[in-house]
Design a protein with these regions (language model features):
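Detector for methionine-enriched segments
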Residues: 1, 14, 44, 108, ...
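Extended, charged helical scaffold/adaptor regions
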Residues: 7, 43-44
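Short acidic active-site motifs
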Residues: 39-43, 141-144
Length: 236
């Protein structure tokens, strides 16, 4: 039986995950799309019966974090880490030949950028890093990118927010989305599937019990059959 996973994500991420998910057996994906990550809590209320929930990024996960304690099924999210940053920077340098110090990049944790640059022993001028927080409107991040572009301090923008990317494209500012490594997405899908299977196996663990019936009390086979049916058990 396949594992049904509800995925809360953007339209762009849906296209990417569909192309990757075919490498994983016995999963069924159902998408709930947002224009902005802040819409994730509303989408949570629309989810149909499924085996697990997957958020297409850290932002939609953070917006729904307070609701997850009430969710009876496993959940997971695509995490932004050093692998994501390094994959994106490598793609940028290879395809666009833009200098690191001419980039504005928005990330969940600025330390990830520092860690990647330290790992490759980069000692030059660092990129302009914009910290993403759910307490700050994404419009502010967009404005900072635009200001750096208008002042000619940058030649390119890397963004983790799909709505910001769409705005930058409309303004014809050179930009790209953050790239989640294919391997990371596959691992997250496999992990989500495993969590669901584990939850199911825990729910159906066999339990041995003893029902003691007083000698002066007679229970017919019909009553015993009703008890075993209600508890999904057998008796001897």
């Amino acid at each position: 039986m396949s594992t049904k996973i509800a995925i809360i994500c953007s339209k762009a991420f849906m296209k990417r995950i569909i192309s990757i998910a075919q490498n994983i057996t016995d999963i069924q994906l159902e998408f709930y799309l947002y224009s902005h990550p802040s819409e994730a809590p509303t989408l949570m209320k629309q989810i149909k019966p499924c085996d697990a929930i997957l958020f297409g990024g850290t932002l939609p996960y953070l917006h729904t974090q307070s609701l997850l304690s009430e969710v009876p099924i496993p959940w997971n999210y695509i995490k932004q880490d050093e692998t994501t940053i390094s994959t994106t920077l490598l793609s940028l340098v290879a395809k666009h030949a833009v200098a690191i110090d001419r980039i504005s990049i928005d990330v969940m944790n600025p330390a990830f950028v520092d860690n990647v640059l330290a790992e490759i022993e980069f000692h030059g001028q660092k990129p302009y890093v914009q910290h993403i927080s759910i307490t700050e409107p994404t419009e502010n991040i967009l404005k900072r990118h635009i200001a750096l572009w208008n002042s000619k301090n940058i030649d390119f923008v890397i963004t983790s927010i799909h709505s910001v990317f769409d705005e930058l494209q409309a303004l014809q500012i050179p930009s790209m989305r953050m790239l989640d490594a294919t391997k990371s997405i596959i691992q997250c899908l496999e992990e989500t599937k495993s969590k669901s299977l584990l939850t199911k196996s825990e729910a159906f663990k066999a339990v041995v019990g003893l029902l003691e019936i007083p000698k002066d009390c007679s229970i017919g086979s019909t009553v015993l059959s009703q008890i075993t049916k209600a508890t999904f058990s057998t008796f001897k």
